[in-house]
Amino acid sequence: MNKILFSLGMLLLTVAAYADGTILFSTAKGSIDVPPYRIPGITCGHGGRLVASAARLVCGTDPGFGRVDCVVKLSYDNGRTWSEHEIDVACGDTSLINAHKTPMEAAYGDPAVVMDRERNEVLIMAVAGCTVYGKPSTNRQNPNLIAAIRSTDGGRTWQKPVDQTEDIYGLFDKGNVVDAAFVGSGKLFQSRVVKVGDYYRIYAALTARPNGNRVIYSDDFGRSWHALGGAAALPVPGGDEPKCEELPDGRVIITSRASGCRLLNIYTYSNTKSGEGCWDKPEKATMDGLALAPSTNPTNGEMLIVPAMRNSDGKPMYVALQSVPTGTGRNNVSIFYKELASPDDMRNAKVFASGWDGCYQVSSTVSMYSSMDLQADDRIAFFYEETLTKWGTKPNPVSTSFPQGEGEHNYDGCELVYKSFDLETITDGKYCVNRRINRGKFLKANYEDIVDSFVLTAAQKRKVKDVIKRLPAEPTSAQMDAILKGEVR
C-alpha cells in the first residue's frame, strides 16, 4: 500500500510540475542580503538528463558591478524531479576587484550552457571579471573577459575556469576588431549534422561592439574557437544578445534581440569542414499578422528547430520555435512557431523572417529571458524568468569601470521557472515531434528547387539532381556542400 501511495504521489508531483512549472531558483524567497537570480539556460542530454544554469547575483546585478556566480541544477528524468540544492559551477571573489585591472576570478555571469550529445561532458561559457559591457572604459585593452568552464560528469562537478578572452577576441583582430563582447546567455547550440573530429560542432553567438553580433564555432567542444565567416564577418551589425540554431540542411541561423522584432541571418557553408562560407543579409522578423508581437522592450530569447509531423495530413517537416516577451514591456513571454515544409520557408533570411504561423503564450505576467531545448521524451524544456523582485540598491565597487566607486546599482532578480510542453500544446494541435523523419528525403525536393535557381547548364543541373536523388537518410556535410555549390563531381 505504501508503494502504491508513493507512486501516486510521484505521479501527482509530475503532473503538477508539467502544469504549473517548477521554480528552480527563487529571488522572492530572499532579501536584500540574499543573492537574487537571473539568466536561465537549459540543455538536454541523452537518457532524460537536463542541466539548468543560472547566474547567482551576489552583487545584486550584472557582472561588472561585483561578484556573480554560475550555478546549475540537474534532472535525470526529463524534468520531473530536480536536484534539491544548486551546484556551484564557478564562484566570484569580491576581494580581487580593483581599479587597475579586472581579474577573471571576480565574477562569472551570463552563463551559456551545452551538454554534448554523445558524452556526459557539459560546457558553460561565461562573461567574467568586473567590467561593464557598455562602459567606454571596457575596450580591447580592458575587455569583458570570457571564461570556459567544463564538467565531465554531467554537471555534478566542475573544473577550474579557463580564460579564453584572447583566444576569442584575437579571432577578429585582423578584421573587424571587437572592443567588448560576451557570449549570448542561455543555451549554446550543438550541431546535429556537422561533426569534425571527435565532437559535433558547437556554436556561440557573441554580443559585441562595435558592429554588433559575431558567431564563433568549435570542433573540440570549446577548447579552441574559429570565427564563422572570418575575421571581418558582421552577420547582424545592429544586433544585441543573440542565439544560434541549425537548419535541417546544416546552415546556421542567428537570431538577435531587437525592439519589436528578432533580427535574423543565415550562414551557408561552401566547405563545412574548413568553415568557409558566407552570410546572407540580416532581416527583421516582426511576426506580422498574429495576435501577439515581439515586445518593444527587447530581451534575450531562444530559437529551437524540431523535427515534426503535421497532424492534419501526416506530412513530415520541421517546426521553428522562437521565444520572446510580447506586448509593450518585459512581460507575457511567448513562443512563436513557423512550419518549415518547403524551400520557400527557409531558402534565405528574408523568407525565414516572414510567414510565422502562430504563437503560444507561456506567461501572463512580468517575464523576460528564456531558453529551451528538446527533451529525450519529445517534450520542449522551457526555462524562463518570471516576476521581478526588487530589494533596493547597493553601492558600485571600486573597479576599472568605477575608479572612485561612484554610484549605485539595483539589487533585484526573478523566479527562474522550468516548464515542459508537448509540441501540440505550443502549436494548437497542428504538429507533433517526429524524430523518425528522413532528413535526406525531406531535403531532396528543397535541393532540387534550389538547383533550378543556379546558373548551370542543363547537363550540370542533371548531374547535381542525380546526386540529390541518391542522398541517404542522413546526408553528410560534404554532400550538402557539393549540392549547394552546384559542384558535384
What are the language-model segments listed below?
Residues 7:
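Anion-recognition interface
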Residues 10-18:
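Hydrophobic h-region of N-terminal signal peptides that target proteins for export
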